[in-house]
Amino acid sequence: MKQELEQLLLAALTRLAGSVLPQMPPADAVVVERTRDAQHGDFASNVALRLAKAARRNPRELASAIVAALPESPLLERAEVAGAGFINFRLAPQAYARELAAIHTRAAAYGESSLGGGERVLVEFVSANPTGPLHVGHGRQAAYGATLANILTAAGFTVAREYYINDAGRQMDILAVSAWVRYLELAGETLPFPENGYRGDYVRSLAEELRTAFGAALRRPAAAVLAGLPADAPAGDKESYIDALIARARELIGTQGFGAVLELSLARMLGDVREDLAEFGVRFDVWTSEREFTESGAIDHALAVLERAGHLYREAGALWFRATAFGDEKDRVVVRENGQKTYFASDIAYHLAKRERGFARLIDVLGADHHGYVARVRAGLIAMGQPGECLEAPLIQFVSLYRGTEKVPMGKREAQYVTLRQLRGEVGNDACRFFYLMRSHDQPLDFDLELAKARTNENPVYYIQYAHARVASVMKQLAARGLSFDCAMGLAAAAKLESSHEQAMLHALTRYPEVIEQAAVNRAPHALVHYLRELANVFHTYYNAEQFIVDDPQLRNARLALVLGVQQVVRNGLTLLGVSAPESM
């Protein structure tokens, strides 16, 4: 309905262009919003206020001209000028009946639109180092990225979902040496575990697999491992110690042996990540290996693009990118003095490759600690001839778990932390997906474990699912009385839905397409969460106030058409969130 009103306004402005208006304004000048007060109609627009200056007219005078130029429409009961120049629209009763019919006709497709025009969007999310199980922070990124991709798809964008596997570099070496030290312990060697190593029980499981796969072939005496190593923390530096330990491991078991430890560790951890996400209902279209990407020549290609454009220079033996010329706070090294390419070089090459794969918009879902990342990568994209605005990076704030009033400790390298799998096991996938999205992604989230498990109306996901199940129960009661639902009769009799509860239900129900577009444009899945809570509240109020299975067949079928419409919209919304819509609870 909102889009149709905007089209009516555009038609009116087209009629006025060249006379009342000097020229046709851009389409984005026309904005229609729902009113907060029903006394002001159903929708309102400030288009006259926005265009008055360019038209050199009083806003109220211009608003009157626009209203007079509006085409006839069965959608509208009337349009009128209000206040300083607002245009208020009151919809005809049949407008809501027609929208209710659209819910029944379009069913699972209701709420979908062509807003995105098929624009290709790549959403990269989670992309956690495969150095341990996913933790609850990764879970929030997964829920946000998956839901955003679903919403963008519903809004008419062509979306691909990608996971970038950080399978190269120092963190993988630390995982491998952590597993090897635990393997040596299993073999009977006594040696301290590195302060900077990964400490979870999963590392002991990796050690068991190493023993099964290699027997004693990788065993080396603890004395040989520790000889000449610098002091570890707290007396020494944990970073220097772990690097020296990695070098010693390569020396003692050889590059091939260390590579075998790394490959087994990577395969197991990446397999665990894939399985965890699949169980969470999160899917990816593409899994890109950092190691394979680095070996593909893509970084050299990106550096060549920068070189040809004159944006690289040499200083102190290193190759630098002139990032400050493109809005970054300082220039960036792309190739170190030793010839090693930097992570930054890999990052900008990866984003150039995304663009060259045909994606118009790149959305990187990142952790809150990546706040300085976007400006750097955007500078690189601009320097390589790409539009800087093609890159977006929603930063996902941290998650804190609470059990009662006690905050649950978390941290990947500590012995105690909460994995996504553990959280899902305790509260279930539905509560996980929903609770992660209850607040805007840019706000910290306190996850209430006890509330998430509660089977009461205080639990918002339960409350929404209960609305869906209640409608299913109504239909079972209908069948038990030997009655059936006549959809055509119900829609034809929609004018009988005239109680205050029914009008509130119709108004809430028909907002759904607008909410999906709003959530897509603002990259805000939480807007859908809030809407579903409001819709469920209106429904439960209606359910408690009215009888649906009444003697009058027209009224009965009209009410059933309404509540089945609610069920459909709730199901559509929950599906986008990755939450189930049960028939009974």
Tell where the protein language model's regions lie, with residue ranges.
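Non-catalytic interaction-recognition regions
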Residues: 1-97, 108-585
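Short, charged, solvent-exposed linker or helix-capping segments at domain edges/interfaces
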Residues: 98-103
